[in-house]
């Protein structure tokens, strides 16, 4: 049984999306809200520097799946080469299980086995550990060579829940 802090009243729709300009704008807005609510180690200037990379990644990542609840975008996950490249959930829906649903889709339907997590984001590292991921390497910089250390994680224990 899954435990969610908040009750989910209506079914969730999870599907791959067509990347229209409108869709990219909606995904970017969710990313912006989620990052500001969860990545407290980033200064405003850091977030501003990431914006062009985020827009590019949303358009170019191999597979992009969204979760909608009651018609509202509540989260998305981007995957490429068996790796989760991005997973963001609306702060209004933190703790509701949407991140887990998206991660399960990534593992089960897209064969994802890897993810990088910021060291300064222990909630994300704990989330992936609960799903069976383990750290196999540490990098002192992120993908843009910024001084934000990363934990490189691999799925090593796949439980029945995922």
Roles of regions detected by a PLM:
Residues 1-22, 159-162:
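Conserved N-terminal entry element of GNAT/NAT acetyltransferase domains
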Residues 22-24, 29-55:
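Conserved GNAT-fold acetyl-CoA-binding loop/helix
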Residues 116-118, 134-151:
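Conserved catalytic-core motifs of GNAT/GCN5-like acyltransferases
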Residues 62-75:
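Conserved beta-hairpin
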Residues 108-120:
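Conserved GNAT acetyl-CoA-binding A-motif
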Residues 83-94, 118:
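A short, internal acetyl-CoA/4′-phosphopantetheine-binding micro-motif in the GNAT/acyltransferase core
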Residues 55-65, 83:
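A short helix-loop-beta-strand connector motif used in the catalytic cores of GNAT acetyltransferases and
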Residues 95-108, 126, 130:
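Conserved acetyl-CoA-binding loop-helix of GNAT-fold acetyltransferases
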